[in-house]
């Protein structure tokens, strides 16, 4: 353990359009090579497209989609004796958000639509309806944790 002081977490500024800190964080997740203005165009374009496609308010749609993707449990590898067990552990709230955002962006990048904004919009609409690749990823993680419930006593 280092003897220096513990560095506090940075406060993220809310995004300028909707005033949401979660959305500002999401823009940072979408961003590639430090190109934030392009990431903002993609996210805001996706929100507009998703809102027009589903007929819901953009920010509410985003919140519902994230809520449907957030995992509650995950598995972590734990070495005991000579074998490695997949131990189910609960996910911290900050990590839940981070994983949900990451999975949403990964699923969007694998889609077939023309632009990233349209891919993201499609994935947002699917996630808000509890379908799509990102929701499938969450279900897979939950299924994995459920299958390894027997090793839950190895938690640390």
Swiss-Prot record:
> What are the record's GO terms for cellular component?
small ribosomal subunit
> Could you provide one GO biological process annotation from this protein's UniProt record?
translation
Q: What is a GO molecular function of this protein?
A: tRNA binding
Q: Any signal peptide, and if so, which residues?
A: none
Annotated Pfam families: Ribosomal_S7
User: What UniProt keywords apply to this chain's record, in alphabetical order?
Assistant: Ribonucleoprotein, Ribosomal protein, RNA-binding, rRNA-binding, tRNA-binding
Q: Which HAMAP family match?
A: Ribosomal_uS7_B
**What is the documented function of this protein?**
One of the primary rRNA binding proteins, it binds directly to 16S rRNA where it nucleates assembly of the head domain of the 30S subunit. Is located at the subunit interface close to the decoding center, probably blocks exit of the E-site tRNA.
What do we know about how this protein assembles, alone or with others?
Part of the 30S ribosomal subunit. Contacts proteins S9 and S11.
Q: Which family does it belong to?
A: Belongs to the universal ribosomal protein uS7 family.
From the Swiss-Prot or TrEMBL record, give the protein name: Small ribosomal subunit protein uS7
Native species of this protein? Psychromonas ingrahamii (strain DSM 17664 / CCUG 51855 / 37)
Q: What lineage does UniProt assign to this protein's organism?
A: Bacteria, Pseudomonadati, Pseudomonadota, Gammaproteobacteria, Alteromonadales
Gene label: rpsG
């Amino acid at each position: 353990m280092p003897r220096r002081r513990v560095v506090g977490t940075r406060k993220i500024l809310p995004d300028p359009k909707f005033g949401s800190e979660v959305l500002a964080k999401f823009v940072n997740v979408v961003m590639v090579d430090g190109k934030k203005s392009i990431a903002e165009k993609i996210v805001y374009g996706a929100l507009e497209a998703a809102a027009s496609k589903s007929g819901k308010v953009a920010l509410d749609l985003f919140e519902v989609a994230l809520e449907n993707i957030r995992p509650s449990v995950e598995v972590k590898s734990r070495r005991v004796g000579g074998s490695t067990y997949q131990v189910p552990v609960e996910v911290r709230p900050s990590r839940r958000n981070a994983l949900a955002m990451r999975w949403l962006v990964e699923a969007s990048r694998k889609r077939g639509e023309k632009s990233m904004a349209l891919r993201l919009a499609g994935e947002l609409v699917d996630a808000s309806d509890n379908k799509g690749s990102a929701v499938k990823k969450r279900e897979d993680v939950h299924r994995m944790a459920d299958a390894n419930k027997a090793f839950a006593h190895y938690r640390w």
